[in-house]
Each structure stands twice: as C-alpha cells, then as structure tokens.
Amino acid sequence: MEQLKFKKLDYSVKKEDGTEEIKKSEGKLPIRATSSSAGLDLYTTRITQEVDNSGKLVLVYHTDIAVEIPEGYVGFICMKPSISKRSIIMCNGIEVIGSDYRGELMAKFKVTTDAIPTVYTTDEPFAQLVIVPCSILEPTLVEELSETERGEKGFGEATAEQNNEIKEVKE
C-alpha cells in the first residue's frame, strides 16, 4: 500500500504586546473511521475567526498538519455528513488540494445562524480528506466538440426518463 505522508506544522500567535510566539503543533494524523472509508477524518487543533465581505462570521478550522499528495492525485477536503447537525457550512463546499501544495490543511466554515452556533470541537472530526487519481490534461481550443446524447442540455435538463420498474437480476 502506498503511503500518504503528513507533517506537523508549528504556528505563530500574536501576543497582547504585539510580539509573536511560536506554538508547537498538536496536529493529529488523519484516520479512517473504518477500513473501507473513502476519506481520512481530519481533526482541528484550533479555531480562528474571520468576517467575510458580507459581515458573516467565518470559522477557520486549523489542523496544524500538511500533506504530500503524490503526483497524479488530487485531494478533496469534504464536509462530514454530520454537518447537517451543525449551524455552519463549508465556504467552498469542497476544498481542492493539488499535489504541489505543502501548506496547512484547513477549512473555512460560514456560520449560518445569528444565535450561538453549534460547531465541531477538537475531539471530533470536522471534515474528511479524500485522495483520488487526477489526469493532468493540456487545454486545447478546437472548432467542434464530439456529439453526445446529452448535447447542450443544461442544469437539470439531462434527467433520464423515469422508469420505476424493478427488474429482477438473475445470477
């Protein structure tokens, strides 16, 4: 089995006197919930706050770890299904990580309530890292594209005709 390499990252914190203090990483190695889980659970070490352009509170979930994604693969930081029990939503919906990125794994969540938000804590996974193969293709401008059954049908226009018949599969 190929290895996916992770590194702990120290971080700096501004003190009240304006100086910076280097803090040792408490980052946890991501883990699979089960042997067949597609994603690796990510845990936060700390949460910082930002305000977006619309004035909404954004929570930044830091992991204090970096990953070395092998060439030919891409990483996706995806929301956990438990997001439906929280009053936050990942800002980008999904984070895309190229194999050349070596910075901290983190995700930003927009608070969706004016009340005190229900959030993830440091003892529970807040997202999952999914690694999949990725073809690096050269963009080329052409005069025509090949024909397909769907053609130019847009959002929601490519729905197959409903046939709710259940067919028995014989082995």
Spans of features found by a protein language model:
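Non-catalytic terminal segments and appended small domains
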Residues: M1-E171
